[in-house]
């Protein structure tokens, strides 16, 4: 996450070395520039930064998407931007992702990305656009080889009760059930 947006805009040599190292490693570079706009936003994106999870205003989100940036709609313990940004889900479904940020355990006990999925469906958004923001877009953007269910892939998936409520009944990682609807069976170290 490149939080030093002044360093990016001023082409600080250390900042630019970090960005170049991420590019050379084939890693996406996450942004942190909530109020960016105009030429500064364009320069920020042109430096190689591909996402922002700090967007708080709908118009800023639209501008970022228009310039090719991916916007992460976040719901965390402190910042909650879903209500302001959810229209982007219909307008730019290929560029929107859901995320949590600084989520406390008590917050996560009430749900994670699935909370935003349910809120989106309750608002009438297309199921496939919602699932795309919850899983496909992040997996593709971050090159996470999970959840595609292709032959030879690791069997990482969830089982839900139906396509309306999407209540998680089981979670599988590498083909092994790690959550059975009641308890997690992952070993904690």
Where are these regions (language model features)?
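Histidine/acidic residue-rich metal-binding segments in metalloenzymes
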Residues: 2, 7-72, 77-98, 108-123, ...
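Short active-site segment of divalent metal-dependent hydrolases/proteases
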Residues: 104
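Active-site microenvironment of metallo-dependent hydrolases
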Residues: 108-124, 128-189
């Amino acid at each position: 996450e490149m939080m030093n947006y002044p360093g990016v805009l001023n082409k600080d040599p250390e900042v630019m070395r970090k960005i170049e190292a991420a590019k050379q490693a084939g890693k996406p570079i996450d942004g942190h520039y909530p109020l960016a706009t105009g030429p500064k936003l364009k320069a920020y994106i042109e430096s190689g930064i591909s996402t922002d999870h700090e967007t708080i205003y709908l118009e800023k989100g639209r501008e970022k998407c228009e310039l090719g940036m991916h916007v992460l709609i976040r719901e965390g313990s402190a910042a909650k931007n879903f209500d302001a940004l959810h229209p982007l889900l219909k307008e730019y479904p290929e560029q929107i992702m859901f995320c949590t940020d600084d989520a406390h355990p008590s917050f996560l006990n009430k749900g994670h990305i699935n909370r935003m999925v349910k809120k989106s469906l309750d608002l009438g958004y297309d199921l496939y656009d919602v699932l795309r923001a919850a899983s496909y877009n992040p997996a593709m953007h971050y090159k996470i080889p999970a959840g595609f269910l292709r032959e030879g892939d690791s069997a990482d998936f969830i089982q839900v009760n139906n396509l309306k409520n999407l209540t998680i009944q089981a979670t599988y990682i590498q083909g092994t059930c790690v959550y059975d609807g009641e308890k997690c069976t992952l070993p904690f170290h």
